[in-house]
Amino acid sequence: MSLRVVYLGTPQFAATVLKTLLDAHTHIVGVVTRADKPQKRSSKLISSPVKQLALSKNIPLLQPIKTTDPAFLAQLREWQADVFIVVAYGVILKQELLDIPTYGCYNLHAGLLPAYRGAAPIQRCIMDGGVLSGNTVIRMDAGMDTGDIANVNYVAIGEDMTAGGLAEALAASGGELLLKTLQEIEAGTVRHVPQNEAMATLAPKLTKEEGGIHWDAPASQVYAHIRGVSPAPGAWTRYLSQGKEARRLGVLSARMESFSGNYGDPGEVLGVSGEDLLIACRQGALRLRMVQPEGKALMKAKDFFNGQSRLVSKLF
């Protein structure tokens, strides 16, 4: 493939896709990623996964503070790219930048557009109980995920799949979809189909508070919520020990109880069952497997329960 490609991306998802392109000998003339960020509880700067991969392959790298900076835009022009590929870069790009490459900018979106436009399509699709996801490649315009569709593929969401697991599956197939798109751009056969605005939905970035579990819902819905916010921002609930204030309990792993009848009041702690802690939902129950009490280490849910002699019998 002779196309000159500039790649813009930041997290591990984008690094996985970039590796697929590099393994296929795509001519990546430059990489753009976000500026290094301080590590949590430390002043040490952490490089993005995309930066680490680019440096390991000796690919020219830019980390602009602002993508509207004239010096940055001038450097992009010097690379004389035929096409820009954007994958989870993390910034909405202005038209001046989109107009630089000969054939435009193409974005790999980890969702089936026009549904789930925004930063969290993977998480919100699972939280909504979705059973099918996929990648969409669009030719970018100045809107948020509003460009014409060039290619789509599909990935089934397994009944126990978390957002982390779906992200891995989408990244693995997304690189191949981009290779197909680049081949079509080079051959002049790529199609651009406008999105159906009537079908558009939004998927804004999740907050930590949205990880909170609402037990007054069917177990299937609660389980979908837990899977959708795992590993980030993470699911949590609250618990009380007598004489103490309510504390958060992170829920790292759970599974559905096979019997779907009524067990008790929503959030009621039904006790230990095998290795799990059984919690009632509005309909059905969930088995908590791994939890993390506030300020403590990760542990088995049954060990948490057995260590809480004064635990009130309800989560909220």
Swiss-Prot record:
It is an enzyme of class 2 (transferase). (6S)-5,6,7,8-tetrahydrofolate binds at G111, L112, L113, P114. Its EC number is 2.1.2.9. The gene is fmt. It catalyses: L-methionyl-tRNA(fMet) + (6R)-10-formyltetrahydrofolate = N-formyl-L-methionyl-tRNA(fMet) + (6S)-5,6,7,8-tetrahydrofolate + H(+). InterPro entries: Fmt, Formyl_trans_C, Formyl_trans_C_sf, Formyl_transf_N, Formyl_transf_N_sf, Formyl_transferase-like_C_sf, GART_AS, Met-tRNA-FMT_C. PANTHER family: METHIONYL-TRNA FORMYLTRANSFERASE, METHIONYL-TRNA FORMYLTRANSFERASE, MITOCHONDRIAL. Belongs to the Fmt family. GO terms for biological process: conversion of methionyl-tRNA to N-formyl-methionyl-tRNA. It comes from Chlamydia trachomatis serovar D (strain ATCC VR-885 / DSM 19411 / UW-3/Cx). The keyword Protein transport does not apply. GO terms for molecular function: methionyl-tRNA formyltransferase activity. This is Methionyl-tRNA formyltransferase. Keywords: Protein biosynthesis, Transferase. Attaches a formyl group to the free amino group of methionyl-tRNA(fMet). The formyl group appears to play a dual role in the initiator identity of N-formylmethionyl-tRNA by promoting its recognition by IF2 and preventing the misappropriation of this tRNA by the elongation apparatus. GO terms for cellular component: cytosol. CDD domains: FMT_core_Met-tRNA-FMT_N, Met_tRNA_FMT_C.
